[in-house]
Curated annotation (Swiss-Prot):
GO terms for cellular component: extracellular region; host cell Golgi apparatus. A motif (RxLR-dEER) lies at residues 46-63. Residues 78-107 form the IQ domain. Induction: Expression is up-regulated in spores. This is Secreted RxLR effector protein RXLR-C06. It comes from the Eukaryota. Residues 32-50 have a biased composition (Polar residues). It comes from Plasmopara halstedii (Downy mildew of sunflower). Residues 25-52 are annotated as: Disordered. Glycans are attached at N37, N42, N105.
Length: 168
């Protein structure tokens, strides 16, 4: 069981990296392949979630499952972890984009009201966007590790209960 959990851990972490690549492809307009009308927009979710190797996340999942020889039970847990973490990263990016839009709207309102100059807003925007542009913030990483450790404890029949996880 422990060997299978180690394989599961490796597979999940590898798939997370693929998910990060796919998410950055989706958000970076220069790396997104244009659709039939050439605009690059209105892509299907499946094509937007392509990894850097041109395969989808689901293809990577199946590849890991077949190469590792995971049992059906462990494969089910693996898919559940990947689905939850993929959803977390999508939600994280959506929240980050909403935050950027709010900052822009607030700055525009301050500029129109004459409270700040264009130069002041430019300096603040650079700092705000730099601080929000990193995917692996300490809080996000701690949260992922904590949830992952709880998952392993729950489905590992308590074998990993002694693994220390710092959450603060």
């Amino acid at each position: 069981m422990r060997i299978q959990l180690l394989w599961l851990s490796f597979a999940v972490l590898s798939t997370i990296l693929s998910t990060c690549d796919a998410t950055s492809d989706k958000l970076d307009p220069q790396r997104v392949q244009p659709n039939q009308n050439g605009s690059g927009h209105n892509q299907s979710i499946r094509s937007a979630l392509k990894t850097s190797h041109g395969k989808t996340i689901a293809d990577d999942e199946e590849r890991f499952i077949s190469l590792s020889g995971m049992s059906e039970k462990i494969a089910k847990y693996y898919k559940a972890i990947v689905a939850k973490l993929s959803k977390y990263f999508r939600d994280y990016h959506e929240r980050r984009e909403i935050r950027k839009q709010r900052i822009l709207n607030k700055s525009f309102a301050e500029m129109m009201a004459g409270q700040k100059s264009v130069e002041d807003i430019g300096r603040n925007q650079d700092a705000s966007f730099m601080s929000s542009s990193f995917l692996w913030t300490p809080e996000a990483f701690k949260s992922i590790l904590h949830k992952y450790a709880l998952f392993l404890y729950k489905y590992g029949n308590g074998h990993l209960a002694t693994v220390p996880v710092k959450t603060g």
